[in-house]
């Protein structure tokens, strides 16, 4: 029988087209049945037509259909891929940033950590739990892959509510290592053995070795990273180029320097001034930039590249939304590799998945979802234990109670636990104003937060 794959949120052209292209190029998934699902029938119909036209043009034997009925879509599913957002993403994100700011709370980014990350979680996790409830009822053995953020809070809450489900979080930040390290170390990516780990958007490179010699490569990373990243262009440079030339910069599969014709950044350590502090003081290289890593650290506001973060937000909101995605027969995300690994019992090592901590990071409890490498075979996704240095472990440990209280607040629908989740978060520097802040957020985001009592 053909493998059945369900895409939840397929009305999003960026998610739908990109994932379809990944699937269509796969030999192991050749001839699969793909069910597109979205609550927006107009957007869903566009994705369906585009997919069918592409299959006809390329003469590929995949079966594609679409439905707005989720339970119908899930019947017989072996794999379910989720990428959803609720409401007007940017309007709600602005509230997540601006309202806490009115109460004296400064945030680096406000999407996945801090107060913004909490309210984002409170909105998006309930509908994901609804999806998971249907999976548990209709296709409980299916593997579920999630691309939605805030990743670690979503995965933690889902596994608390549905511990029996095969739910895996996927993020592409790990791909930064493939973009930068070969150029930095003057070797091919295939010659590097790498391990990274932590929490989603809060992970660091832990080990690096040259395969041909077996020698430690991390010493070279620490020695060469300062000069390399100090001159690497960032989003301020990309935004300026886009405004000047009226076209987007394509950094997929290459560095920003190559995309901008070999130019250096207009200022040092673009997007990475917090990154620089972590590298210098903790001797570990983050696998992401300040906008993500800084969301979880109370002192990040002092040292983050705010110019780069604001320019990234502007670029993301004003330019990326206008890009017309297309279906291409090339692998862009790693979820297809995992599905292939399960179907073929390959036993390959996947660089990063978000799964419950089953002793993979000793400084963290079992309930929290961690980002670690994993072995993929016919039995599924098996995390690999990693050694986290004490200092990084301390930063990660600050998230334990936040994730615990976020999950409990959502499952119980508890306003009091939301207040507590804010009060244990070191990004928050307020106390008496927090109950009022929570009430204002519930009022302003009533369609999504009215379950909190």
UniProtKB/Swiss-Prot annotation:
One GO BP annotation of this record: carbohydrate metabolic process
Role noted for this protein: Alpha-glucosidase with broad specificity. Hydrolyzes maltose, palatinose, maltulose, trehalose, trehalulose, turanose, leucrose, sucrose and maltitol. Is not active against alpha-galactosides, e.g. melibiose, and alpha-mannosides. Shows an obligate requirement for an O-alpha-glycosidic linkage, since it is not able to cleave beta-glycosidic bonds (cellobiose, gentiobiose, lactose, sophorose or laminaribiose). Cannot hydrolyze phosphorylated alpha-glucosides derivatives.
Organism taxonomic ancestry: Bacteria, Pseudomonadati, Pseudomonadota, Gammaproteobacteria, Enterobacterales
Consequence recorded when altering residue 173 to S: Loss of catalytic activity
Catalytic activity: Hydrolysis of terminal, non-reducing (1->4)-linked alpha-D-glucose residues with release of alpha-D-glucose
Active site: 172 (proton donor)
Activity regulation, per record: Is inhibited by EDTA in vitro.
Pfam families from the UniProt entry: Glyco_hydro_4, Glyco_hydro_4C
Recorded consequence of changing residue 174 to V: No effect on catalytic activity
Factors inducing expression: Down-regulated by sucrose and up-regulated by palatinose.
Pathway in which this enzyme or protein is active: Glycan degradation; palatinose degradation
Protein name per its UniProtKB record: Alpha-glucosidase
């Amino acid at each position: 029988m053909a493998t059945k794959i369900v895409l939840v949120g397929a009305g999003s052209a960026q998610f739908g087209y990109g994932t379809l292209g990944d699937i269509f190029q796969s030999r192991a998934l050749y001839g699969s049945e793909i069910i597109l699902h979205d609550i927006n029938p107009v957007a869903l119909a566009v994705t369906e037509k585009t997919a069918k036209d592409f299959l006809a043009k390329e003469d590929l034997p995949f079966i594609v259909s679409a439905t707005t009925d989720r339970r119908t879509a899930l019947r017989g599913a072996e794999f379910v891929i989720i990428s959803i957002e609720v409401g007007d993403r940017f309007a709600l994100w602005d509230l997540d940033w601006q309202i806490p700011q009115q109460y004296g709370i400064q945030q680096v980014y406000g999407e996945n950590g801090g107060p913004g990350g909490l309210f984002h979680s409170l909105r998006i996790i309930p509908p994901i739990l609804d999806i998971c409830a249907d999976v548990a009822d209709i296709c409980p053995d299916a593997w579920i892959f999630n691309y939605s953020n805030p990743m670690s809070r979503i995965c933690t809450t889902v596994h608390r509510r549905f511990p029996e489900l095969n739910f895996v979080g996927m993020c592409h930040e790990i791909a930064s290592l493939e973009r930068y390290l070969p150029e930095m170390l003057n070797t091919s990516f295939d010659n590097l053995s790498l391990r990274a780990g932590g929490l989603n958007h809060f992970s660091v490179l832990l080990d690096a070795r040259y395969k041909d010699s077996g020698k430690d490569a991390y010493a070279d990373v620490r020695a060469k990273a300062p000069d390399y990243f100090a001159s690497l262009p960032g989003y301020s440079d990309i935004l300026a180029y886009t405004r000047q030339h009226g076209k987007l910069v394509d950094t997929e599969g290459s560095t920003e320097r190559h995309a901008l014709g070999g130019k250096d950044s207009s200022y040092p350590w673009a997007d990475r001034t917090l990154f620089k502090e972590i590298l210098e003081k903790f001797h570990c290289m983050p696998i992401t930039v300040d906008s993500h890593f800084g969301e979880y650290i109370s002192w990040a506001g002092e040292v983050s590249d705010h110019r780069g973060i604001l320019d990234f937000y502007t670029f993301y909101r004003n330019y990326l939304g206008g890009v017309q995605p297309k279906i291409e027969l090339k692998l862009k995300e790693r979820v297809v590799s995992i599905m292939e690994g399960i179907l073929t019992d390959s036993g390959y090592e996947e660089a990063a998945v978000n799964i419950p901590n089953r002793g993979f990071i000793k400084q963290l409890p079992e309930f929290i979802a961690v980002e670690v490498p994993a072995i993929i075979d016919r039995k599924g996704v098996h995390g690999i234990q990693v050694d986290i240095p004490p200092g990084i472990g301390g930063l990660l440990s600050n998230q334990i109670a936040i994730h615990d209280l976020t999950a409990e607040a959502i499952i119980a629908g508890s306003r009091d636990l939301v207040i507590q989740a804010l009060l244990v978060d070191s990004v928050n520097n307020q106390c008496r104003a927090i109950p009022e802040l929570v009430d204002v957020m519930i009022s302003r985001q009533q369609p999504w937060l009215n379950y909190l009592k």
